[in-house]
Amino acid sequence: MISTRHWSAPGFDTMVMGLIFPYAATTRDITVRVAPRYLPDQSDPDAPRHVWSYHVRIENGGSEAVQLRSRRWLITDGAGRCESIEGPGVIGQQPVIEPGMAFDYVSGVPLATPSGTMDGAYHMTGASGGFDVDIPAFVLTVPAAGGH
């Protein structure tokens, strides 16, 4: 899922956005929202392998266009093992996000434990130079039986 679209529709209830994306952080008018989801069909607890997808929405509430140049993730599993991942852009793209627009993407992460956390930052550039945008820390947990 990749899209760039206007995100401030008239009358849109911001509380709804908080329900869809339970994790959010804002840096210099750029809001990063994250919604993780456990994927039981791709997981095998006996392996052990637990897989989550995470939907990220990056909203540009500022007055200038920004380009996402790189990402840095810190992934910590339930045993406290940390992995740092850095690279250019996201999902093979370095999107330009115009003022009042948003960029969405979905990616995934496997862990050997049934819980963990992720956080990090995106490096952005704009007319006023480069800056880092926080990715909110979010929790990865296997839901109770019957949940997703």
Task: Report residues per predicted region.
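Low-complexity, acidic Ser/Thr/Pro/Gly-rich terminal tails and inter-domain linkers that flank the onset
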Residues: 16-48
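Terminal connector regions
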Residues: 110-148
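Asparagine-centered strand-capping/turn motif at beta-strand->loop junctions
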Residues: 58-62
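Short glycine/serine/proline-enriched coil/turn segments at secondary-structure junctions
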Residues: 43-44, 64-65, 112-116
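Short acidic, flexible loop segments centered on an aromatic residue
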Residues: 64-83, 124
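Intrinsically disordered, low-complexity Pro/Gly/Ser/Thr-rich segments with frequent PxxP/GP/PP motifs
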Residues: 84-115
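Short, solvent-exposed loop/turn segments enriched in Ser/Thr/Gly
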Residues: 48-54, 118-119
